[in-house]
Amino acid sequence: MLGTSGNFSVVVSRNPLGLAITASAVSKGAIRPADVLAIGAEGAPIGKRGGRPSAETALHLAIARTRTAGAVLHTHSIWSTVLSEIHGDEGGLRLSGFEMLKGLEGVRTHRHTEWLPIFENDQDMPALASRVEAMLQQSPAVHGFLLRGHGLYTWGDDLAQARRHVEILEFLLEASGRMEAARRHGPDQNS
């Protein structure tokens, strides 16, 4: 993880919903126990631990509620940022034909087409969370989504599955981006 980018959460209770989420502005490459906060179903911290939850806590809660996910991971990579800008006006990005698609939970064939929705990055987190939650209810098969110019959100039943989804989707984004570049300009002679 680059610097303080991204945020991670794990569901610690379902009824009521509670998350352990990384605090804002901490290095995600060197997370310590003090960098993780407990939050309730409305996003407010529980307990007296220092730090503040990520501004994007509402998105983690929306995903945990809608997907009954056990973990939610948000990353900022070059490929998710660039491709979300290139395909933002299309509302999403289709990933298909790659063997690595089978690394996504429930996908059994490389012939699968994964739709990765792209949302405009919005500082009104409750409004954005509402749009994300509506999409997740309407599109139960998606494994993640992109925030335009920002990064990837994905989830899993547990932290290991969520991490696998990050790895698979980031691979697919890079492969798609390189293929698009090769189609437009020919193969990169320097890689």
Model-assigned labels for residue ranges:
Residues 1-191:
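Glycine-rich flexible loops
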